[in-house]
Regions:
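Feature captures the FAD/FMN-dependent oxidoreductase FAD-binding
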Residues: 146-147, 151-153, 203-254, 373-386, ...
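Ferredoxin-type iron-sulfur electron-transfer modules and their immediate structural context
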Residues: 1-151, 199, 241-257, 377-380, ...
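Beta1/beta-strand and adjacent pyrophosphate-binding region of the FAD-binding site
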Residues: 147-160, 279-289
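Short acidic loop-to-helix transition motifs that present clustered carboxylates
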Residues: 222-226, 267-270, 345, 372
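Extended, hydrophobic alpha-helical segments in both membrane/secreted and soluble proteins
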Residues: 159-164, 285, 291-295, 323-326, ...
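Beta1-alpha1 glycine-rich phosphate/pyrophosphate-binding loop at the start
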Residues: 29, 61-78, 116, 120-124, ...
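FAD-site-proximal beta/loop scaffold in flavoenzymes
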Residues: 259-283, 289, 301-304, 374, ...
């Protein structure tokens, strides 16, 4: 039986409930039309597009790339392990895989096309595996190139500044990081609790960047106060501002000026610095985002101590910049912690898992309420927060009369947003204190100055990392005196087939036109000087689920990470890492759920179903990622079956148009 006959038999239908007028009890056999009459001038070509996970990633990681490495489809160079190769692919965009694998809210997973089949791919979980494996194996970055003559001043040692220093050094530029705090890390260190971003791993990921060399660090110095801006300008060839937003917004209601009304930013910084070791008995936090969840989770862990010295109260610690001197023998009791949010639970901006963990730890969450007033006692201290149910009119919350509630509080924390602190740098800010930039992250009014991170607009850590990377590229263009070209529509890191061919010693030859018998070479399919039958649209197009053959993918449960979330009775002083990372076996299993949107993942469908035997596997000694199959155009009739059964949308009909 021929291959066509086998395929025809597979497509023939069994008896149906309906009998046609001629008495035939079977559907008509369309195989002849499909295999012999559905011809066209169009032939398959291989189109590389960006998957939506990468298009949704603010730091611009080649997510599909390192997932394919972990699952074993894209092979590591000889002598390099899978985990190290995945680490190098991941950190080409983001030098903090372990941190982002833990705390990033993962917009990539929301955009994952696998959501149309069963559930998103656990991208964060696999990224954490990559980062933690790199930490255990002590992977280092490749040696940096020789230095260029220019040097960059980076003001701020948080995720944006560190990302920029890393990318600049890979391009041959030295930098000086000016950080006003005692350690690098920014919000990763001073805004997120240690049980979410383990400090030993954070230190390792920062030191890995500094070990590239020629990245000078100046700590405990604030530019604009301790160091004049002019001095920095005169000693550097460009300046990058990555100073973040360190002022928390206070509640815009009566009584919020009470001394025991704090911002979430200040509360978390005092805790992360180790100065705040015990909290208050009754804590109320207003928010709904990730910062507010960190506040209430920390408050539950701190607990409270009866008869605490007023000079060591949380507000005294925050306002006075002193540390609590709490005896280890002091008996801590549980704190009554409440979080209020304008929005219903499903509308809160905090990560769903973080919200659920907070509830598991004993936090009470009241949704759909608006803070009305802070009630004070005779001394001026806050004793309660008055809230009311609310509704939205013209996108503004309006309190509903008669629904007021009184929440007793010893400490009220506002986690409703952040604003810049630009004391000494007022000339650089707009009327709200933020720095205005153009599309290339150049400061709009200051030549040679660039900006990245929250000082533009408060957003995610991954956003700051991505902006730092793009700003570093703009700085290079500035040094090269080149025109600033328009950024790609899909502005992320992409798989590059030419680079892959070079890596495997398969780089195309130099083209030489045939002198004799020029007709002998009819097209590029027989030329070793070009990548035949391939088009890279990754910088312009994101492939939607509608371009995939979703029927290929069977239902597979997501491999979830374990958690060590304490109960309300266990939460006091519980500072262990809550997330239990995937084993290598589970990481491979979860990475294998990736549908490889926009790139061949070697399923063989096109080879199996081609009725003309026109599609064939490329010989192993010249095959690589993206060049697994090819087409014999002497056999191809343009029937489009290969494109129809391609699960990843990599094959398109159109060559010859």
């Amino acid at each position: 039986m021929t291959k066509i006959e086998k395929t025809v038999n597979l497509m023939k239908e069994e008896n149906t409930y309906r009998r046609y007028e001629d008495g035939d009890s079977k559907y008509s056999d369309f195989s002849k039309q499909i295999f012999n009459e559905d011809k066209s001038h169009k032939c398959p070509t291989y189109i590389h597009k960006t998957p939506p996970c990468q298009g949704s990633c603010p730091s611009g990681e080649d997510i599909r790339g390192w997932l394919q490495i972990v699952r074993g489809i894209e092979k590591a160079p000889e002598g390099m392990s899978m985990s190290e190769y995945a680490f190098r692919r991941s950190t080409s965009a983001n030098p903090f895989p372990s941190q982002m694998g833990r705390v990033c809210p993962a917009p990539c997973q929301s955009g994952c096309n696998r959501n149309e089949v069963d559930d998103y791919v656990g991208i964060n979980a696999v990224e954490q595996f990559i980062g933690d494996k790199a930490f255990k194996e002590k992977y280092k970055f490749d040696a940096a190139p020789e230095l260029n003559k220019e040097r960059v001043a980076i003001i701020g040692g948080g995720p944006a500044g560190l990302s920029a220093a890393y990318q600049l050094r890979k391009m041959g530029y030295a930098s000086t990081i000016f950080e006003e705090r005692e350690k690098l890390g920014g919000m990763m260190r001073y805004g997120i609790p240690n049980y979410r971003t383990p400090r030993d791993i954070l230190d390792a990921e920062i030191n890995r960047i500094l070990e590239l060399g020629d990245i000078e660090v100046v700590l405990n110095k604030r530019v604009g106060k301790d160091i004049p801006m002019e001095e920095v300008e005169n000693s550097h060839d460009a300046v990058l501002w990555t100073i973040g937003c360190w002022n928390g917004k206070s509640l815009p209601i009566e009584g919020s000026d009470a001394p025991n009304c704090l911002s979430g930013v200040a509360f978390l910084e005092a805790f992360c610095q180790g100065r705040l070791k015990v909290g208050s008995k009754k804590v109320v936090c207003v928010g709904g985002g990730d910062t507010s969840i960190d506040v209430v989770s920390v408050a539950r862990r701190l607990g409270h101590i009866s008869n605490l010295n007023p000079q060591e109260s949380p507000e005294a610690v925050v306002h006075g910049y002193v540390a609590q001197d709490v005896s280890e023998s002091a008996i801590k009791e549980g704190a009554n912690v409440t979080l209020t949010s304008l929005f219903q639970k499903e509308e809160m901006t905090a990560a769903e898992q973080e919200v659920n963990d907070a509830v598991h730890e004993g936090v009470t969450i009241i949704n759909g309420v608006l803070p009305i007033k802070v009630e004070k006692d005779e001394s001026g201290r806050a004793v309660a927060l008055i809230i009311a149910e609310c509704k939205f009119e013209d996108n503004k919350p309006i309190a509903i009369e008669g629904t007021e509630q009184r929440l007793e509080a010893d400490l009220i924390v506002s986690a409703i947003g952040q604003s810049p602190d630009i004391e000494g740098l007022e000339s650089l800010g707009n009327d709200k204190g933020f720095f205005d930039v153009d599309d290339f992250y150049r400061h709009k009014t200051k030549e040679g100055h660039f900006v990245a991170g929250d000082i533009i607009r408060p957003h995610l850590l991954t956003t700051a990392i991505g902006q730092g990377s793009i700003a570093s590229q703009s700085i290079k263009s500035f040094f090269d005196n080149k025109d600033f070209k328009r950024r790609p529509k899909v502005d992320v890191h992409h798989f590059n087939l030419l680079d892959k061919l070079r890596e495997t010693d398969l780089e195309p030859e130099t083209y030489t036109a045939p002198i004799e018998n020029p007709d002998k070479q009819r097209g590029t399919d027989t030329s070793g000087a070009v990548i035949h039958n391939y088009e890279d649209r990754s910088a312009q197009e994101i492939i939607p689920s509608t371009e995939l053959f979703l029927g290929h993918f069977k239902h597979e449960e997501r491999v979830k990470r374990g958690e060590a979330v304490p109960t309300g009775d266990e939460v006091i002083d519980h500072y262990e890492d809550r997330i239990i990372g995937l084993s290598e076996e589970d990481a491979i299993k979860e990475a294998s759920r990736c549908m490889s949107c926009g790139m061949c993942f070697e399923c063989d469908n096109c080879v199996i179903y081609c009725p003309q035997d026109a599609v064939f596997r490329v010989k192993k000694d010249v095959a690589t990622m993206g060049r697994y199959v090819d087409t014999d155009y002497d056999k191809c009739i343009g029937c489009h079956i290969c494109a129809d059964v391609c699960p990843t949308g990599y094959i398109k009909m159109g060559l010859g148009e």
